[in-house]
Amino acid sequence: MRQLKGKPKKETSKDKKERKQAMQEARQQITTVVLPTLAVVVLLIVVFVYVATRPTITE
């Protein structure tokens, strides 16, 4: 049967399995890449704010 333009094709079980695999890999990347990077950025901000606002001792 000819596929008409603009209508999405019906998702096969193979397509569904590939999509689920891609989503699983994306979730795994979130925990292995995004969270440690975010933790480093937050740590840098905290250190910067601490250094910028610490009291200085003048003699």
From Swiss-Prot:
Coiled coil: 9-31
The keyword Ribonucleoprotein is assigned to this record: no
Ranges of biased composition (kind: Basic and acidic residues): 9-22
InterPro entries: DUF4519
A cellular component term, taken from the record's GO annotations: membrane
Similarity comment: family membership: Belongs to the SMCO4 family.
The protein's name in its UniProt record: Single-pass membrane and coiled-coil domain-containing protein 4
Gene: SMCO4
